[in-house]
Amino acid sequence: VTSGAADVLRLLTVRGETLAVAESLTGGLVAAEIASVPGASKAFRGSVTAYATDVKRDVLGVEGTLLAERGAVDPQVAAQMAAGVRRLLRADWGIATTGVAGPEPQDGQPVGTVFVAVDGPFETVFGEPGGEKVTSLRLNGDRTEIRMESVRSVLALLLEELAGEQTGNERAQDTERNGGT
């Protein structure tokens, strides 16, 4: 898994940007993975393990009505966790994990239902702030496998956003440079 964390940190460091992590089902595994990379302190601000529902609400600012209506395993909850930890720890990027590692279903969701989210300085095509990205996963395996795959998935989602933004910028520069000749 560490290569994903190393790639994320390399891109963040190059960009001079920072990361905060909010975790539920992964219980600190994402933060541990990031912190295991030498030089992580250049970009990693910290994390909140919001395992209990009231911590998601009271610390990360997830809407109480959303939690009451949908439960903690929900794409909007993941999005609000990522936005909340980003705001709380004053980071450029926030990532979050919430889901059901098992062995029992939770909030009406089957084991292996996981939502990972990224919140960051996105821009839409019109240059407006673009909010957050959430990925819905249906994972197989035991509790440990589901948690480890959730770590890989949230880091991959962030890496995709970081690399995508960089690629987009490079393409735009190429187009300008070669435009009209």
Model-derived features with residue positions:
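Short alpha-helical segments enriched in small residues
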Residues: V1-T181
